[in-house]
């Protein structure tokens, strides 16, 4: 199978038999949404299989963006004020929208994470660091900084669900992290998201998934403008859970193998995106940096560029964006295709 058959997402077919078994619990209770019976099953599976620590709550949401916004809204409600966050320019727009619309955008450093030198002279309450496409920053640099400066630390792990740092899943670090289970992500099916957060904030976040309404208060419950309908429905949960049950180990192993091939056979003039995991990361795409800017239409196979900087005046973010090449990484990718990609990129390097 050649590069003309290359796909960004693996062929994800529903296991209808397994989905039907899962949905039977919904049929028995006639509850398919509003936190029905499959939600807790999915949260338990994520905790156990993604090795999430007991000090963290696992809370599924409708998608990765709603996970980030529900997380921030819940913390705002808990602390009784709207917090000011700093986010990096090299990331997805979610961290500058909704409850984060007033976040401060700063550049990244040469390691691919938020530049801590850029926050020295500004007032803020917390930082959001994005781990890019499965690669992780030097996490302890941010943990130590936020601890020393009494700041909240959130990791946007939308595409980094199973990369380890110093022996534990990177999702366990900071006060919280979020994961995306969007269909384009390695572990996703359809659409979904997940918050992994210190248990201190769990109750306010769960209430925030339901417009801020605390059902235990009955008629006394009041909605919150720091909340919304962020809940995942049980039908989505069933498809995600079924896909994970059947494939998560295969995804972890194959994505590690793919990364290993690129690591040992880097195309000329390309280098891997910065990564601080000792073991191979589980990447959502293989991110390579060329030694000079190039146009994506010069690459003769399916590939992309992420992320267009939120602030185009951020020099390091813009440099990364102009030089990055994001290559498909999924369980359907064959070794033959990988080596063909490497060969094509070597030719590209010779001609450019």
Curated annotation (Swiss-Prot):
Pfam families: DegT_DnrJ_EryC1
Gene3D superfamilies (alphabetical): Type I PLP-dependent aspartate aminotransferase-like (Major domain) (3.40.640.10)
Sequence intervals crossing the membrane: none
Signal sequence annotation: none
GO MF: pyridoxal phosphate binding; transaminase activity
Gene Ontology biological-process entries: polysaccharide biosynthetic process
Listed PANTHER family: DTDP-4-AMINO-4,6-DIDEOXYGALACTOSE TRANSAMINASE, TRANSAMINASE
Entry protein name: Uncharacterized protein L136
């Amino acid at each position: 199978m050649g590069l003309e058959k290359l796909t960004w997402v693996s062929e994800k077919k529903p296991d209808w038999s397994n989905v039907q078994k899962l949905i039977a619990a919904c049929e028995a209770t006639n509850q398919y949404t509003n936190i029905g019976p499959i939600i807790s099953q999915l949260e338990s599976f994520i905790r156990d299989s993604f090795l999430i620590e007991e000090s963290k709550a696992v809370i599924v949401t409708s998608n990765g963006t709603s996970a980030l916004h529900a997380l921030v809204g819940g913390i705002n409600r808990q602390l009784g004020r709207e917090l000011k966050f700093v986010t990096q320019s090299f990331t997805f727009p979610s961290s500058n929208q909704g409850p984060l619309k007033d976040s401060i955008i700063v550049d990244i450093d040469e390691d691919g994470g938020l530049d801590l030198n850029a926050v020295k002279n500004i007032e803020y309450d917390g930082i959001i660091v994005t781990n890019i496409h499965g690669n992780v920053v030097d996490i302890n640099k941010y943990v130590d900084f936020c601890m020393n400066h009494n700041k909240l630390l959130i990791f946007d792990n939308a595409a980094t669900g199973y990369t380890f740092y110093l022996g534990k899943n990177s999702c366990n670090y900071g006060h919280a992290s979020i994961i995306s289970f969007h269909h384009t992500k390695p572990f996703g099916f359809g659409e979904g998201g997940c918050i992994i957060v210190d248990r201190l904030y769990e109750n306010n976040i769960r209430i925030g998934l339901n417009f801020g309404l605390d059902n235990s208060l009955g008629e006394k419950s009041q909605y919150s403008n720091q909340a919304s309908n962020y809940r995942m429905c049980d039908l989505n949960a069933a498809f995600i859970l079924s896909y994970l049950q059947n494939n998560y180990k295969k995804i972890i192993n194959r994505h590690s193998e793919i990364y290993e091939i690129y690591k040992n056979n880097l195309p000329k003039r390309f280098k891997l995106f910065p990564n601080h995991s000792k073991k191979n990361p589980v990447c959502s795409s293989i991110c390579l940096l060329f030694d000079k800017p190039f146009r994506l239409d010069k690459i003769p196979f399916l590939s992309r560029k992420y992320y267009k900087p939120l602030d185009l005046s951020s020099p390091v973010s813009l440099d990364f964006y102009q030089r990055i090449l994001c290559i498909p990484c999924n369980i359907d990718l064959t070794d033959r295709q990988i080596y063909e990609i490497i060969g094509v990129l070597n030719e590209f390097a010779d001609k450019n």
